[in-house]
């Protein structure tokens, strides 16, 4: 699934098997919507103008797929840092569960997974979150909790609802345009998963880690759009 390089060695577009090359602007009305970091600071999509942004949807109460996405992003971040691109690339996870994913909960999640300071964990007002994800074409909806209900890992209380959502990675170029989209579950089986993150996984999450679906994406594959957008080869961590 790696992208093709020309004779100059400049990385080319990623494989169509990984996702779709697009060229979609993010309107000022969306880019300027107010978001909040886990530190409680205001920000927006437009605040990252000049950087390549890898944006993923998630919720902190997911213990199946979302932690595997987070794990892959952590691996990708290390590879980007090793390539000397830390100032040019930003990784961000934006919740689809803003009612529960407060800045305080995002901080607890950051501590749990060991995310570096340069990785953004974002929330916002529900209407803002809905506008952004609808504009970007990522589907999610609140659904009833199963029976018996799961348990909130932070409070120990029974969960009262869940959020179904599409698993997506969106790559924004330095001008703020969406240039590549990956839709599908992550394959973290070949990546070094932190012990704390592994313990956080539910039984289904551990099964997905051990036996990923054939159509999933790996951290190494998901680096190719970043290499294309920065014009710099990026070697997977540990290679």
Please identify what each model-predicted range represents:
Residues 43-73:
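Short active-site neighborhood of thiol/selenol oxidoreductases, capturing the structured segment around
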Residues 28-29, 52, 164-166:
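Short, small/polar residue-rich loop motifs at catalytic or cofactor-binding pockets
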Residues 118-204, 208:
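Thiol/selenol-based redox catalytic cores and closely related redox-interacting motifs
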Residues 1-36, 219-239:
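N-terminal targeting signals for export/organelle localization
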């Amino acid at each position: 699934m790696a992208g093709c390089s020309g004779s100059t060695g400049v990385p080319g577009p990623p494989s169509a098997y990984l996702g779709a090359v697009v060229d979609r602007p993010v309107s000022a009305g969306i880019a300027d919507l107010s978001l909040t970091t886990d530190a409680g600071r205001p920000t927006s999509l437009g605040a990252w103008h000049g950087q390549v942004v890898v944006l993923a949807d998630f919720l902190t109460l997911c213990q199946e797929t979302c932690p595997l996405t987070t794990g892959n992003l952590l691996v990708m971040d290390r590879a980007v840092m090793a390539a000397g691109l830390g100032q040019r690339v930003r990784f961000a996870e934006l919740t689809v569960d803003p009612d529960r994913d407060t800045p305080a909960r995002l901080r607890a999640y950051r501590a749990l997974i060991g995310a570096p300071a340069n990785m953004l964990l974002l929330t916002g007002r529900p209407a803002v979150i809905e506008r952004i994800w609808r504009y970007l074409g990522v589907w999610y909806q609140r659904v009833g909790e199963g029976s018996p209900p799961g348990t909130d890992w932070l409070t120990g209380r029974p969960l009262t609802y869940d959020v179904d959502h599409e698993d997506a990675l969106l790559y924004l170029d330095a001008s703020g345009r969406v240039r590549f989209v990956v839709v599908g579950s992550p394959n973290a089986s070949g990546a070094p998963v932190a012990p704390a993150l592994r313990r956080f996984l539910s039984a289904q999450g551990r099964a997905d880690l051990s036996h990923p679906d054939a159509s999933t994406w790996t951290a190494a594959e998901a680096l190719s759009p970043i290499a294309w957008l920065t014009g710099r080869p990026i070697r997977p961590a540990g290679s």
